[in-house]
Design a protein with these regions (language model features):
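Long, non-catalytic architectural segments outside compact domain cores
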Residues: 2-14, 18, 24, 31, ...
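Carboxylate-rich helix-loop segments that flank metal/cofactor sites and access channels
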Residues: 2-7, 68-118
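Alpha-helical bundle segments that constitute or directly flank the non-heme di-iron/ferroxidase center
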Residues: 10-44, 104-129
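Alpha-helical scaffold segments that form or flank carboxylate-/histidine-based iron centers
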Residues: 17-25, 46-65, 103-109, 133-145
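Charged/polar positions within long, soluble alpha-helices
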Residues: 34-41, 64-71, 75, 92, ...
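Short coil/turn residues that cap or connect secondary-structure elements
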Residues: 43-47, 98, 102, 129-130, ...
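Conserved alpha-helical segments that form or flank metal/cofactor-binding pockets of metalloenzymes
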Residues: 50-85, 155-156
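Preference for long, well-ordered alpha-helical segments
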Residues: 113-163
Length: 163
């Protein structure tokens, strides 16, 4: 029985590497989807909530494209986020119960998460062992990831300088 993220018998060495990198991006991007959904629930400004939900939807499309590529390579795509991210969300929930949460704190956490995600994608793009097809897909999807990071970084900087 194959586990999510596992390989089928017909993968080559290059495909195995591509699948591994793609599954790592899938896992981290699922974390991003979960983070955006949590942020939408916590935001007090409805404009932020709507934008968080829109970003979650965009990230789901990214995950879908990456999963399709893993399947085309003969692998089984990841279907869960990381254990570390789940633990981090639990910590944030506890922290928020103790200290409270406001939109500035939510935006700061989104900015932090986006920076982490962006780094994972840049590392993948710098991986010389990827096939050109996989690298091309990662580059296409990275454009959406980078745009999200840039947007929230600007919002966070504006909120920080305003108060």
């Amino acid at each position: 029985m194959l586990e999510p993220g596992g390989l089928t018998g017909g993968t080559s060495g290059g495909s195995t590497h591509d699948i591994s990198v793609l599954n790592s991006l899938i896992e981290t991007t699922i974390d991003s989807v979960d983070g955006y959904r949590r942020s939408a629930q916590e935001a007090t400004n409805s404009r932020f909530s709507q934008e968080f939900l829109a970003r979650a939807s965009e990230r789901e499309q990214v995950v879908s494209a990456l999963r399709d590529r893993v399947r085309s390579l003969g692998g089984n795509p990841e279907d869960d986020g990381s254990v570390l991210a789940a633990a981090h969300r639990a910590f944030l929930t506890l922290r928020d119960k103790v200290t409270g949460s406001d939109d500035a704190a939510v935006i700061a956490e989104v900015d932090h998460g986006e920076s982490y995600l962006n780094g994972k994608w840049e590392t993948a793009l710098g991986d010389g062992g990827l096939s050109s097809e996989t690298r091309s897909l990662i580059q296409q999807q990275y454009d959406s990831v980078r745009e999200g990071r840039d947007t929230w970084r600007r919002v966070h900087q504006n909120m920080s300088s305003a108060g």
